[in-house]
UniProtKB/Swiss-Prot annotation:
Subunit composition and interactions: Probably interacts with PlsX.
Keyword vocabulary terms for this entry: Cell inner membrane, Cell membrane, Lipid biosynthesis, Lipid metabolism, Membrane, Phospholipid biosynthesis, Phospholipid metabolism, Transferase, Transmembrane, Transmembrane helix
Organism: Prochlorococcus marinus (strain NATL2A)
Entry protein name: Glycerol-3-phosphate acyltransferase
GO annotations of cellular component type: plasma membrane
Pathway assigned in UniProt: Lipid metabolism; phospholipid metabolism
GO molecular function: acyl-phosphate glycerol-3-phosphate acyltransferase activity
Gene giving rise to this polypeptide: plsY
UniProt family annotation: Belongs to the PlsY family.
Subcellular location(s) of the protein: Cell inner membrane
Amino acid sequence: MNLLILFFGYLFGSFPSGYLAGRIAKGIDIRSLGSGSTGATNVLRHIGKRAAITVFLLDVFKGVLSILLAKYLLLNDSWQVAVGLSTLIGHIWPVWLNWKGGKAVATGLGIFLGLSWQVGLATLGVFIIMITLFRIVSLASVSASLALPLIMFLSFSGSNLSLPFLIVSLLAMILVIWRHRENIVRLIRGKEPRIGQP
């Protein structure tokens, strides 16, 4: 039964919201444009604000839904984390799109909102602060992912810390940074575009 839930978690994550937005709105394959990601940032740059907001909310919802399902089925912390990871993997490597999906930010946010809404909101707060100051989505995404494990650790006191939650926060951080490796190179070179720039 639990393995079946992991499978459904992957399916939730692999729902190609960004790809469908491109096809429906403009008849394009968003993977062939810009960063090649199916995430909200690439959708914003090549389709528009309304489509990007829709994709962002759908991607967050995928993460939240998978964790809520795991909690509804009374799965323990380890299995909740496993379901979250399967959802994140589905988002990054969707079988329907030849394993080419998003960069794990919005769906990752949804997963952590589901696991611990306080941690999710605090991490979102870091993202909002960085995006407000610098207007560079990748910088905000990487900064929030780096802050995530610390936020997870600080949000629990002593024996209340869930080791699986802490481990998944570290894994999510690694995945987000790895998916943004090209952005990080451009950031170092001072060539990463800000919001509103092509």
